[in-house]
Amino acid sequence: MAKVEVVNKDNFKELVLDSPTPVLLDFYANWCGHCQKLLPLLDEVAVDMDGKINVMKVNVDENRDLAQKFEVKGLPTMILFKGGSEVDRLIGFMPKDKIAEKVNAKI
């Protein structure tokens, strides 16, 4: 994949829950400064971990139901899904190497 895909309520099941590849899903908002700082790092993670994980993002303002379903309380929140289930949650901005370290520990 090697790029960050956009997820919404219509394609969430197909792209995240039914994915045979683990998915790192970033819950973000356009008004969130830390979210905007994180986006280019996630682009790099998508390239660096291509074939190991799919990196996706969901705008919480446009997909409030998904944010509520997964009890997203702060932004950015990244949830790692494997086999359709949440296996880890990363809250707040963090450097690329820390994201990769946490993801690699769970996949």
Regions found by a protein language model. Name each.
Residues 4-23:
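A short beta-strand-turn-helix
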Residues 8, 28, 54-56:
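Conserved Rossmann-like nucleotide-binding pocket used by diverse enzymes
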Residues 20-22, 37-58:
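Conserved helix-turn-beta segment immediately C-terminal to the redox Cys motif
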Residues 20, 28-31, 74:
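Short pre-active-site segment immediately N-terminal to redox-active cysteine/selenocysteine motifs
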Residues 66-75, 79-81, 85, 93:
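Structural alpha/beta surface segment adjacent to cysteine/selenocysteine redox centers
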Residues 27-41:
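Conserved redox-active cysteine motifs that mediate thiol-disulfide chemistry
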Residues 82-107:
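Non-catalytic, surface beta->alpha helical segment in thiol-disulfide oxidoreductase systems
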Residues 60-66:
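Structural microenvironment flanking redox-active thiols in thiol-disulfide oxidoreductases
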